[in-house]
Amino acid sequence: MAGHLTSDFAFSPPPGGGGDGPGGPEPGWVDPRTWLSFQGPPGGPGIGPGVGPGSEVWGIPPCPPPYEFCGGMAYCGPQVGVGLVPQGGLETSQPEGEAGVGVESNSDGASPEPCTVTPGAVKLEKEKLEQNPEESQDIKALQKELEQFAKLLKQKRITLGYTQADVGLTLGVLFGKVFSQTTICRFEALQLSFKNMCKLRPLLQKWVEEADNNENLQEICKAETLVQARKRKRTSIENRVRGNLENLFLQCPKPTLQQISHIAQQLGLEKDVVRVWFCNRRQKGKRSSSDYAQREDFEAAGSPFSGGPVSFPLAPGPHFGTPGYGSPHFTALYSSVPFPEGEAFPPVSVTTLGSPMHSN
């Protein structure tokens, strides 16, 4: 390392000064930083990193100027790197509070300002803040009222012995629209949207008033519950009757109303039951016929792989069989044109499963 420094910097006079002349510096060691920051005579080329011949001499590509941080904020502006000075003078130290060493300001005595928000955006935000306080206060007040009413509704419902489903059915009796148990539950838990809570609150408020004043509301609710709980029973047809209907369907898939009435009278069924059975049977026949037609078309067209299985050996070298699938080294493919007899690669059938093979 010392030899390298000696070959580069030892006995090297600064540019522009003679080493042997009177008053010149004596040959000896020169500090590289002093030599690099040396400024030549006025009018002469200055030596420094990134200035004039400096980058070409040292073979260093010019790099972007460093950023100067003022108060923790970076600004973008024309800057000059450290050690870059204007021609015609030496570097001079600058007092604190001004720009850094070698940094040119974009205005006389004014430091660059950091990027700030545009005044228009600030004005819009202020206008929004001036308009929103009243609306936000109203919304908060409504939210508090909804919370209190939800608690009151739950207490009143439990006290009077109503379930959430009963409340929904009673609303249907009073206002013609039945609400589900889930809706009432979500209202009490404040899980509905603010808009839906506001829409549902007047109806529930009337329900609370009716529950307090109307003594027959409980009976009305029970009657409505029975009506809603009564469901249409699933029709069950005996096998003997189903067989007779199947025979009649084969004779006439689409009977008229008179024929349906006659069939229902003979079999002891209701007209609607017979009509629905024939309708369902026709739909079932359409589905089965379409599936059968598709299968026939596929068989008529033939499989795209009509040729027999053809086995091709893998590339030479160690192979590892797939665990659980035996040890064949042949990949079975299907060719549309089978190989004629006597040619290479006859089909090979694998009947046994072997353990995985490993090469040594």
From Swiss-Prot:
One of its GO terms (molecular function) is DNA-binding transcription factor activity, RNA polymerase II-specific. DNA binds at residues 157, 164. The modification Phosphothreonine is found at residue 235. Residues 230-289 bind DNA. GO terms for cellular component: cytoplasm; nucleus. A motif (9aaTAD) lies at residues 4-12. This is POU domain, class 5, transcription factor 1. The modification Phosphoserine is found at residues 111, 236, 289-290, 355. Keywords: Cytoplasm, Developmental protein, DNA-binding, Homeobox, Isopeptide bond, Nucleus, Phosphoprotein, Transcription, Transcription regulation, Ubl conjugation. Interacts with PKM. Interacts with WWP2. Interacts with UBE2I and ZSCAN10. Interacts with PCGF1. Interacts with ESRRB; recruits ESRRB near the POU5F1-SOX2 element in the NANOG proximal promoter; the interaction is DNA independent. Interacts with ZNF322. Interacts with MAPK8 and MAPK9; the interaction allows MAPK8 and MAPK9 to phosphorylate POU5F1 on Ser-355. Interacts (when phosphorylated on Ser-355) with FBXW8. Interacts with FBXW4. Interacts with SOX2 and SOX15; binds synergistically with either SOX2 or SOX15 to DNA. Interacts with DDX56. Its main location: cytoplasm. It is found in: Cytoplasm; Nucleus. The POU-specific domain mediates interaction with PKM. The 9aaTAD motif is a transactivation domain present in a large number of yeast and animal transcription factors. There is a cross-link at residue 123 (Glycyl lysine isopeptide (Lys-Gly) (interchain with G-Cter in SUMO)). The keyword Nucleotidyltransferase does not apply. Residues 138-212 form the POU-specific domain. Belongs to the POU transcription factor family. Class-5 subfamily. Residues 1-51, 88-114 are annotated as: Disordered.
